Each structure stands twice: as structure tokens, then as C-alpha cells.
């Protein structure tokens, strides 16, 4: 029997990413794991609905044996079986992030025995999670360059606290994964400011994109009023398309926060990205660690190595025979991954 990998859920930034990465890697490598202190670094520790859905989705996709899969649990034991392609549907039962559930199981389905379709119901545009727009416009185009055939479709927008959204991904098994190198982003080709409004007055979106335009005069503006009772909710994004990749920065309207404050939050993050010579933003960097590790090669630059990034690297290195090297240079960090020397 494969050895059980013991993981401390409180390590590093102590969030749900440790669990999601462990589930993905356990399914792919066949190595079971035990985790204690799940989300110990959070105000509400233990498994929330979103994390529990990710655990149960992983369990169904690989026929795993699992202990500790209940709300609030800070302990989990997961013993995977073979990954099975097919049609899957999961409901979070809250406004928890559909995208984080998808990002847990999709890497495993790159190695499945056939094509798959995964549909998840919950939130699609959440604080502290990649939005559906980020997945479709930023992450998946980079995965395609690595040889991964995956396409996500937004079925219905879902915002906190109501949820009610849905997204589905169709994925084919990958013959092999290629490395990816993102050292420089190249020239900026296009900037787009977009406000999504669901049961929110139109002037809110107009003020948001106007504020972004003041920061980025080249930006194209788009205000979208969503139909179908998916609100209330408001998401603002700034998409920056460069020669080598697309980045997207987002913030969400909150009661008591002005449209201008929401826009300034996005502008601050985007300006910080553009002021750095690094190719990749801080959040995208987190999303690249697992696919690059599975490819066994690749490199990117990021303005700084966040606690989230370092924690994710530490988990990946427990499951895969790869090594990450980080080198600081010229106001940025270069992150490189390579396969471990078989003699080491």
C-alpha cells in the first residue's frame, strides 16, 4: 500500500488551498493523505460547504475512501482510487466558489480514462476566489499552451450571498503536458474595464468603469446588466491583454462601499502589476504551480512570492518528484520548476 502523506493544514497561510492541492495530487499520484488542522488559519476553521463539496467531488471522481468529510471537520483522511472520466454534477448548497471546486478536480481529469463534463452549482464571482471570467480568459488559454484541452462555460452568474450560479467544464485527457515559460509579459495590447450588475442600479457600473478609465485612459468600457434573477451582485474587472498572456483583476461591490472605492481597489492591484517587470500577477502565480509541476518543467516571474504561493509549492513537493527554485532579481521573483534528479 502506498505510504500515507501527513499534512498540516495550518502550515503557511493555513487556508483551503492546502486541501484542494492535496486532493488533486492524491487523485493523480494515487498517494493517500491525512490532514489535520484544516483551515486553522481562518476565522471559521474546518471544512465549509465549498471545501466539503470539493472533497466529495474528488471522492466520486476517483472512488476514494474518505474519513472526516463533514462540515466543520479539521481532520481528513483520503485514500484515492482510479480516476474515472464521465458526467458529474455537484451542488455546493451555498454561494461558495464553483471555480475552486472545479480547480480541485479538473487536474485529475486531465489524466482520466476518457472525456468528462463537470457541472458545479454555487457562486461564480466570489471574493478571495478566481472568477469564472478569470478561469475562461486567463487560466485556460495558458493551459491550452501546455497541451490541456479544457473549456469552461458560465451557465449562470452567482454572487455572494445568494449564490444560484453554475459553471460547467468539458475536459479531454491530455496526451502529455508541456512546460510553460512566462518571463516577460511583453507590450500591453488592450485593456478592458467591465462591470457586471445583477439587480444593482446601472449608474453603479457606469461610475465604476468611469473611475477605472480615469486611471487607464486606454481602457475600453463595458457595463453589463444581467438578467434572470441572479442577484443582487456586482463584479468589476480590468482585463489586461499583453503579448504573452492575459491578466484580470477584480473586486466586488459590497453594501456600504462606494462604486469609486471598488474601482480604486481594482486600479491599485492592476497598477501594481503594470509597475512591475514580472509577467504574472500574484493570484495567477498560485494557479500555475500545479500544472507546471505536473509538466515537470517551466518558469514564470512574479512581483513577490506570497505565503499562498510558498505553501502551495510545499504541498506539491510532498507528492511529486519536482523541485521549485525561487530567485530574486530586478524587483521580481523568478519561479522555476524541474524534475528531481533520479539520484537525489
From Swiss-Prot:
Superkingdom per UniProt: Bacteria
Keyword field: ATP-binding, Cytoplasm, Ligase, Nucleotide-binding
Pfam families, per the entry: RTC, RTC_insert
NCBIfam families with a match to the protein in the record: PRK04204.1-2 (NF003246), PRK04204.1-3 (NF003247), RNA_3prim_cycl (TIGR03399)
Any one Gene Ontology BP term: RNA processing
Family affiliation: Belongs to the RNA 3'-terminal cyclase family. Type 1 subfamily.
GO cellular component terms listed in the entry, alphabetical order: cytoplasm
Name of the protein this chain belongs to: RNA 3'-terminal phosphate cyclase
Known catalytic reactions: a 3'-end 3'-phospho-ribonucleotide-RNA + ATP = a 3'-end 2',3'-cyclophospho-ribonucleotide-RNA + AMP + diphosphate
InterPro entries: RNA3'-term_phos_cycl_insert, RNA3'_phos_cyclase_dom, RNA3'_phos_cyclase_dom_sf, RNA3'_term_phos_cyc, RNA3'_term_phos_cyc_type_1, RNA3'P_cycl/enolpyr_Trfase_a/b, RPTC_insert
Top enzyme category: ligase
Purpose of the protein: Catalyzes the conversion of 3'-phosphate to a 2',3'-cyclic phosphodiester at the end of RNA. The mechanism of action of the enzyme occurs in 3 steps: (A) adenylation of the enzyme by ATP; (B) transfer of adenylate to an RNA-N3'P to produce RNA-N3'PP5'A; (C) and attack of the adjacent 2'-hydroxyl on the 3'-phosphorus in the diester linkage to produce the cyclic end product. The biological role of this enzyme is unknown but it is likely to function in some aspects of cellular RNA processing.
Molecular function GO labels: ATP binding; RNA-3'-phosphate cyclase activity
Name of the gene encoding the protein in the UniProt record: rtcA
Organism from which the protein derives: Salmonella agona (strain SL483)
Amino acid at each position: 500500500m502506498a505510504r500515507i502523506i501527513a499534512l498540516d493544514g495550518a502550515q503557511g497561510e493555513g487556508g483551503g488551498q492546502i486541501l484542494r492541492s492535496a486532493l488533486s495530487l492524491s487523485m493523480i499520484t494515487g498517494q493517500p493523505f491525512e490532514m489535520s488542522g484544516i483551515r486553522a488559519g481562518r476565522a471559521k476553521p474546518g471544512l465549509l460547504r465549498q471545501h466539503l463539496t470539493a472533497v466529495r467531488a474528488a471522492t466520486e471522481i476517483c472512488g476514494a475512501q474518505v474519513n472526516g468529510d463533514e462540515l466543520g471537520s479539521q481532520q481528513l483522511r483520503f485514500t484515492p482510487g482510479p480516476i474515472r472520466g464521465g458526467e458529474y454534477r455537484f451542488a455546493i448548497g451555498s454561494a461558495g466558489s464553483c471555480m475552486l471546486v472545479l480547480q480541485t478536480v479538473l487536474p485529475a481529469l486531465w489524466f482520466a480514462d476518457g472525456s468528462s463534463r463537470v457541472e458545479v452549482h454555487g457562486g461564480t464571482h466570489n471574493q478571495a476566489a478566481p472568477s469564472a471570467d478569470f478561469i475562461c480568459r486567463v487560466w485556460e488559454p495558458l493551459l491550452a499552451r501546455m497541451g490541456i484541452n479544457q473549456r469552461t462555460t458560465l451557465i449562470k452568474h452567482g454572487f455572494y450571498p445568494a449564490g444560484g450560479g453554475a459553471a460547467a467544464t468539458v475536459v479531454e485527457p491530455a496526451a502529455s503536458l508541456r512546460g510553460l515559460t512566462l518571463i516577460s509579459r511583453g507590450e500591453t495590447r488592450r485593456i478592458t474595464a467591465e462591470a457586471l450588475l445583477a439587480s444593482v442600479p446601472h449608474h453603479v457600473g457606469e461610475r465604476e468603469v468611469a473611475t477605472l478609465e480615469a486611471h487607464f485612459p486606454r481602457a475600453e468600457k463595458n457595463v453589463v446588466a444581467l438578467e434572470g434573477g441572479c442577484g443582487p451582485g456586482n463584479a468589476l474587472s480590468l482585463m489586461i491583454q499583453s503579448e504573452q498572456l492575459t491578466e484580470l483583476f477584480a473586486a466586488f461591490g459590497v453594501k456600504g462601499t462606494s462604486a469609486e472605492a471598488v474601482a480604486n481597489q481594482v486600479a491599485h492591484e492592476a497598477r501594481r502589476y503594470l509597475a512591475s517587470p514580472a509577467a504574472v500577477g500574484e493570484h495567477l502565480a498560485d494557479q500555475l504551480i500545479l500544472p507546471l509541476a505536473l509538466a515537470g518543467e517551466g518558469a514564470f516571474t512574479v512581483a513577490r512570492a506570497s505565503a499562498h504561493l510558498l505553501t502551495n509549492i510545499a504541498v506539491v513537493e510532498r507528492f511529486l518528484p519536482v523541485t521549485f527554485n525561487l530567485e530574486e532579481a530586478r524587483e521580481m521573483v523568478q519561479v522555476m520548476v524541474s524534475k528531481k534528479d533520479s539520484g537525489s
